[in-house]
Structures are given as C-alpha cells and as structure tokens.
Amino acid sequence: MIQQETFLTVADNSGAKRIQCIRVLGTNRRYAHVGDVIVATVKDAMPNMGVKKSDIVKAVVVRTKATMRRDTGNSIRFDDNAAVIINDDKNPKGTRVFGPVARELRERSFTKIVSLAPEVI
C-alpha cells in the first residue's frame, strides 16, 4: 500500500531514480495499490535526462511490498515499491521498463507499460 510520503523506486529510464508520493489520485483515497495513479515529486534523478529533481510527475504503481490477493486465491508480493512515470495520456515517459510488473496493469489499460516490461507476473 502506498500512501502520502512513501518513497518509491522508478522502474523506467525516464531519468528519475526515486520519487515520493504526495497524493493518491481518486476521490478521497488514502492508499494506492498496483495499477493506481499517484502524483509524486522527484527526489533523486540522473543528470541531463528528461526528468529533473523536484519535478512534479504522475506515476503508476507497478510493484508493492504489500501482499496482494488475486481472484484466483493466489497472493503475490514484490521486493520493493516501484512506479513508472507517465504523461497525461497514460503513456510512459521512458522507453524501457525494468523488473517485473503485475498482471493487473493490463486490466487497467496500461498496455504500453505491460508490453515494455521484461516479465509480467
């Protein structure tokens, strides 16, 4: 579960390394899960890239440490909290996605991120 002030690693090559959640988008929502869109600020970035430190960005959560139950009865959790930076059209700003992503992204119409990911769990 991601809430305000949570730090996430960035799982793409947009230039940001770490972001901090400042708002979970949705009507009065407190927690974000896999597939939810958040507003975040860039805390650590690589120089000369598309995203700079202290930029305000939108991102979609692709991995969480919290256990996630699926309809089939399986449960899944990842080793880190990670997100992919997106633009207003829900397309990723980077051209590569690092690490596995959850299958729930396909159901939430983030098919571009799913196609760029090396592994879908």
Curated annotation (Swiss-Prot):
Disulfide bonds, paired cysteine numbers: none
GO terms under cellular component: cytosolic large ribosomal subunit
Keywords: Ribonucleoprotein, Ribosomal protein, RNA-binding, rRNA-binding
GO molecular-function term, one example from the UniProt record: large ribosomal subunit rRNA binding
GO BP, one annotated term: translation
Keyword match Transmembrane: no
Pfam families on file: Ribosomal_L14 (PF00238)
Quaternary structure and interacting proteins, as annotated: Part of the 50S ribosomal subunit. Forms a cluster with proteins L3 and L19. In the 70S ribosome, L14 and L19 interact and together make contacts with the 16S rRNA in bridges B5 and B8.
Chain's role: Binds to 23S rRNA. Forms part of two intersubunit bridges in the 70S ribosome.
PANTHER family (UniProt xref): 50S/60S RIBOSOMAL PROTEIN L14/L23 (PTHR11761), LARGE RIBOSOMAL SUBUNIT PROTEIN UL14M (PTHR11761:SF3)
Name this polypeptide is given: Large ribosomal subunit protein uL14
Organism the protein comes from: Synechococcus sp. (strain CC9311)
